[in-house]
Curated annotation (Swiss-Prot):
This is Tetraacyldisaccharide 4'-kinase. It holds the Pfam family LpxK. It is an enzyme of class 2 (transferase). InterPro entries: LpxK (IPR003758), P-loop_NTPase (IPR027417). GO terms for cellular component: plasma membrane. Keywords: ATP-binding, Kinase, Lipid A biosynthesis, Lipid biosynthesis, Lipid metabolism, Nucleotide-binding, Transferase. The keyword ATP-binding applies. ATP binds at T52, L53, G54, G55, A56, G57, K58, T59.
Length: 327
């Protein structure tokens, strides 16, 4: 799904005003659901969520938190509902056996770093995490899902976008009214720069919540300077990917933005290959897109690999250590 343009316009936009009554109902129901008590998991849960629909950087945040938890002596497993996959689970994701159409693209990436469980039913998934040897469960997304009690919830915000027009879906990108989501959050992860994100940071700090500023950095050793590329992506903000490539010196001769979580088909690959051949350029995409490509295409596409780097990692470590002390 591509976010409608009016989501980033003022809330007085005609379409936003037209859909606002529906948004009040949807947002209110979601907020009521968030307030319900959850089942007690076998081990503590760290939830990595966001206030809005769409991408904000949750997957790289979850991967960074796995690394930090291991540094603290914990054994994390990741729990995902497997958005975009047809298997309900609970199951342990195996990148060598599963495809994105079965378990979703994000779990395939997460499984490269730690045991990853896909489960529509989160309590069942949490039990499988424990059976896999975990002593802390990192839940990718799920801030609005009340089925499990969470020990700590961090909301990820894209600094360049913030909350858009600040209205609940479908009038805007919010999953529920912001005022009713704040009580469920213990900290903010602000990814990237921008005035929308700084406004969110100011509100979080006014509520006494820590703000962990971070940015996505390319993997060391990647050399994109002067490289002619056809860049394509089906993520929440493909333009952000294109801008990153340009900042690294790549010469983008063509851009192709697909909807978020787009399931690439042979026809897509044929069109992309023809475009690259015509332009005398290499194809490049994101890690999340790469796992959704047809098998025969993966070796022919360059991948921009990124990781999340925190401005003050010590502060985040302290929050994690307090929430998940070693026994």
């Amino acid at each position: 799904m591509r976010p409608p343009g009016f989501w980033t316009r003022p809330p007085t936009h005609p379409l936003a005003r037209l859909l606002a009554p529906v948004g009040r109902v949807y947002g209110g129901l979601t907020a009521d659901r968030m307030d319900r008590p959850g089942a007690e998991p076998p081990y503590p849960v760290l939830c990595v969520g966001n206030f809005t629909l769409g991408g904000a950087g949750k997957t790289p945040t979850a991967l960074a938190l796995v690394r930090l938890l291991r540094d603290l002596g914990r054994t994390p497993a990741l729990l995902s509902r497997g958005y975009g996959g047809r298997l309900a689970g609970p199951l342990v994701v195996d990148p060598a056996r599963h495809a994105a159409a079965e378990v979703g693209d994000e779990p395939l990436l997460l499984a490269q770093a730690a045991p990853t469980i896909v489960a529509r039913d989160r309590p069942s998934g949490a039990r499988l995490c424990a059976a896999s040897g975990a002593d802390v469960i990192v839940m990718d997304d799920g801030l609005q899902n009340p089925s499990l009690t969470k020990s700590l919830s961090l909301a990820v915000v894209d600094g360049g976008v913030g909350l858009g027009n600040g209205l609940p879906f479908p009038a805007g990108p919010l999953r529920a009214p912001l005022a009713r989501q704040w009580p469920h959050v213990a900290g903010l992860v602000l990814v990237g720069e921008g005035s929308p994100g700084e406004a969110m940071a100011a509100e979080a700090e006014s509520r006494g919540l820590p703000v962990h500023r971070a940015r996505l950095v390319p993997e060391a050793g990647s050399d994109w300077a002067g490289r002619r590329v056809v860049a394509f992506a089906g993520i929440g903000r493909p333009q952000k990917f294109f801008e990153t490539l340009r900042s690294l010196g790549a010469e983008i001769v063509a851009e192709w933005a697909f909807p978020d979580h787009h399931p690439y088909r042979p026809g897509d690959w044929t069109a992309l290959s023809a475009l690259a051949a015509r332009e005398g350029a290499s194809l490049v995409t994101t890690e999340k897109d790469a796992v959704r490509l047809p098998a025969e295409a993966r070796t022919a596409v360059a991948v921009l690999r990124v990781a999340l780097a925190f401005a003050d990692e010590t502060r985040l470590r302290q929050q994690l250590a307090a929430a998940f002390p070693r026994a």
